[in-house]
Each structure stands twice: as C-alpha cells, then as structure tokens.
Amino acid sequence: MITGKLITVEGPDGAGKTTVLEQLIPLLKQKVAQDILTTREPGGVAISEHIRELILDINHTAMDPKTELLLYIAARRQHLVEKVLPALEAGQLVFIDRFIDSSVAYQGAGRGLTKADIQWLNEFATDGLEPDLTLYFDVPSEIGLARINANQQREINRLDLETIEIHQRVRKGYLALAKEHPKRIVTIDATKPLKEVVSVALEHVLALLLA
C-alpha cells in the first residue's frame, strides 16, 4: 500500500531542474520530518543506469524513435519496482528527476510518436501510478541550449545534439501537458534567478504536504 507522496521534476534540456532539486531538498528537510528519496530517470538502479548509457551514447545516432521509447519504458519499469515503489510503500517522499511526462514530451511531441501508444506503454510500465505533483520548469529552447553550451562541466549526450526545432517541439509538448493536467502539473518560470525558482518550487511542495 502506498502511503508516501510522489513528486516528479520535468523540463526541457537546460531548464536547470536538476540544480533546483539539489537546492530544494536540503531546504525541505528543514521543514518536514518525512524521509526523502531523490532519484532519476532513466537510471536510479543498476539495470536502468545501463539502459541510460545506451540511450544517451553519442555514438547511437541511428537509434529509432520507437527503440528509444521502449528503452525508456524498460528503464522506468525496473526503476519503479526496484526503488520507487518500495520507498512509496514505506511512506517516503519520493522525487524523480523525469518520469512519464518526459516520454510524452520527448518521444511524442519531439519524435512524433503517437500519444496514445506512449500513454499505453506508460500505463503498462507503471500500473497506472501517477505523480501527486509535477514541477515543470519552463524555459525557451534558445535559453536552455545556451545554458548547456555554457556549462563546461556538463557531459554532452546524444539528445544534446538534436536540432533546436526538436527542442522547441519538446517544450510545446510540455506546455500542452501542463494545460491538460493543471491540478497535477505546476509551471515554474525557470528563467528567473535560481533562488527565486527554488523558493517557488518549495512553496508548491509544502502546499501539497500540508494540504
């Protein structure tokens, strides 16, 4: 039985969501007694991390969109049963850096795969599990890619090599999802100063936990 809460963090490449999460968690631990788990997709457990390497390898430019989607789904399933569900059943507050919405935005809007197929596969992999809250960090594609290019410490992966048109379609996909699920997905302007972005994210998380 799930007694914990699931919060997912989403955004186009360069939105800074991972950095926000790193700063958000210590602040949250000062305010709640609940155990907190942070993890990521694809990855989080050994099998899923191996799949992550396959997906992001810059040499795998021939990867078919359906192959890409199925790899993400496989990584999601393993991560869920091995790490996420046990934590939720233990009553923990779980943060995942990317989850089901990424598939709709990237492989759906970005790659042009059918939304219905993606939703069915997500349902199959998660047994219908949905986040209690999704923090979507929005940033224009031009700004996001500029941030990536300016970050000398960030390792470039296969998805970073995509055209700006694909990144723009991904963003449009996210915005459509936010409009479709306004109660679950909150949109946060990630062009604002980092401290302000973290503060807004914290407010939304606390609102969920104190509701």
Swiss-Prot record:
It catalyses: dTMP + ATP = dTDP + ADP. ATP binds at residues 11-18. The keyword Kinase applies. CDD domains: TMPK. It is an enzyme of class 2 (transferase). Disulfide bonds: none annotated. Pfam families: Thymidylate_kin. Keywords: ATP-binding, Kinase, Nucleotide biosynthesis, Nucleotide-binding, Transferase. Its EC number is 2.7.4.9. One of its GO terms (biological process) is dTDP biosynthetic process. One of its GO terms (cellular component) is cytosol. GO terms for molecular function: ATP binding; dTMP kinase activity. Phosphorylation of dTMP to form dTDP in both de novo and salvage pathways of dTTP synthesis. PANTHER family: THYMIDYLATE KINASE, UMP-CMP KINASE 2, MITOCHONDRIAL. Belongs to the thymidylate kinase family. This is Thymidylate kinase. It comes from Streptococcus pyogenes serotype M49 (strain NZ131). The lineage of its organism: Bacteria, Bacillati, Bacillota, Bacilli, Lactobacillales. The gene is tmk.
